[in-house]
């Protein structure tokens, strides 16, 4: 029997992922737990929580929220379609001489983008070039919007 800490951590983690309609695979639940446990203990605790936690198609979710499985699968399929374009846009941004790194963030980064998703990026700019990087990213966004894609440079650091 557990002291309740692990069970509480499992429920809190699943409740958080539920906000995003994102049931978790066992490995994801293990990774996102705020406490470190052995995978075997996690599986045991899930067995004890069978009235509060459901499991289907290798996904864990809060009981009564089984519909989010379909949502996750739809969003994963949609994200797969967008990923190639997002990588292409990221390569264009990364080719600018004052951009040191481009990282995809947001819902697309975790393959959970809905139909109206934009492309969220984190940019690492050369020293003293944050505003230049932002200006070019916003200018490039004006271009990509012609093709129905919105770029959002959510975080720009130097």
Regions found by a protein language model. Give the residues of each.
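Conserved catalytic core of two-metal-ion nucleotidyltransferases
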Residues: 137-158
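Catalytic micro-motifs at enzyme active sites that drive phosphoryl/nucleotidyl and oxygen chemistry
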Residues: 89-91, 104-112, 140-144
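Short, hydrophobic/amphipathic alpha-helical patches that form generic packing surfaces
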Residues: 12-16, 135-141
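A structural signal for short, well-ordered beta-strand segments and their strand-loop junctions
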Residues: 101-104, 154-156
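Helical scaffold of the NTase/Pol beta-like nucleotidyltransferase catalytic core
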Residues: 1-102
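Catalytic metal-binding acidic patch
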Residues: 106, 110-131
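Residues in well-ordered beta-strands of folded domains
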Residues: 61, 122, 154-158
């Amino acid at each position: 029997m557990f002291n309740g800490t692990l069970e509480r951590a499992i429920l809190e983690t699943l409740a958080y992922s539920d906000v995003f309609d994102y049931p978790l695979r066992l490995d994801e639940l293990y990774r996102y737990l705020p406490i470190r446990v052995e995978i075997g203990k996690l599986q045991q605790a899930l067995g004890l929580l069978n009235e509060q936690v459901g499991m289907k198609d290798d996904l864990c979710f809060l009981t009564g929220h089984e519909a989010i499985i379909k949502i996750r699968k739809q969003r994963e399929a949609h994200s797969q379609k967008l990923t190639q374009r997002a990588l292409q846009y990221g390569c264009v941004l990364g080719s600018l001489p004052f951009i040191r790194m481009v990282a995809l963030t947001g819902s697309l980064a975790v393959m959970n983008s809905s139909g109206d998703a934009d492309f969220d990026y984190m940019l690492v700019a050369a020293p003293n070039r944050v505003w230049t990087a932002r200006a070019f990213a916003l200018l490039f966004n004006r271009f990509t919007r012609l093709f129905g894609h919105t770029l959002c440079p959510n975080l720009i650091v130097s």
